Amino acid sequence: MPFRATVLTLYPEMFPGHLGVSLAGKALERGDWSMEAVQIRDFAGDKHRTVDDTPAGGGAGMVLKPDVLARAIDHVAADDGRPRLLMSPRGRPLTQERVRALAAGPGAVVVCGRFEGVDQRVIDTRGLEEVSIGDYILSGGEPAALVLLDAVVRILPGVMGNQLSGVHESFEGGLLEHPHYTRPQIFEGHEIPAVLTSGNHAAVAQWREATARRLTAERRPDLLERARHPKRDPPQPVKK
């Protein structure tokens, strides 16, 4: 069954956005994956279609109401087994590992936050997994949702023309990607590294590995540290 994305948002016109063009757009037209953008306001219970209210305890901004969002989630998700994701700056960082896990599943329900945030009770009762795309604040969850779905859709079977393109990329092997070069041989006095035009495939692979490790050490030493000390599952209690 194709990957199915359902996005809950106050701005459904923002979707599919850039995912409606290029390889992702062609795959969408072919039915390799599907997207539905659902207006949260449609689940408000008053004539003004109110979706937010003032924060309990005071403070600036407004909070997305739990009853409205819960009705929206229940309507689109029910018990279909798809993970329910809330785009949030306080969520766990999105990683390529999580992206691969999502791509291997049936799809996702993605909730786009707005205002000051979402009432914690709907997060708890509807099992929303908070996901962050970085340590910065956006005006809403829609751009973050597009980033997440872009990362997932591009590695779905049949989306990329060359599946190897998705294998030799940053983060796929725990390293940043090596530099790329193409013709002309000399550009403004700078030549393509000789090893890349030597025809020696083993030497090319070795050069790419070495430069990837150097770049990772310079720019993302945390990735190397993570590879040296992978997370392990906590020990399970012995059953007597």
From Swiss-Prot:
Alphabetical GO biological process terms: tRNA N1-guanine methylation
Cellular component per GO, a single term: cytosol
Enzyme class: transferase
Top-level taxon of origin: Bacteria
CDD domains from the UniProt entry: TrmD-like (cd18080)
Positions of S-adenosyl-L-methionine binding: G113, I133, G134, D135, Y136, I137, L138
Name the record gives this protein: tRNA (guanine-N(1)-)-methyltransferase
InterPro entries tied to this protein: Alpha/beta_knot_MTases, tRNA_m1G_MeTrfase_C_sf, tRNA_m1G_MeTrfase_TrmD, tRNA_m1G_MTases_N, tRNA_MeTrfase_TRMD/TRM10
Species: Rhizobium meliloti (strain 1021) (Ensifer meliloti)
Recorded GO MF terms: tRNA (guanine(37)-N1)-methyltransferase activity
Alphabetically ordered keywords of this record: Cytoplasm, Methyltransferase, S-adenosyl-L-methionine, Transferase, tRNA processing
Stretches the record annotates as Disordered: 215-240
Encoding gene, per UniProt annotation: trmD
Record-linked HAMAP family: TrmD
Similarity annotation: Belongs to the RNA methyltransferase TrmD family.
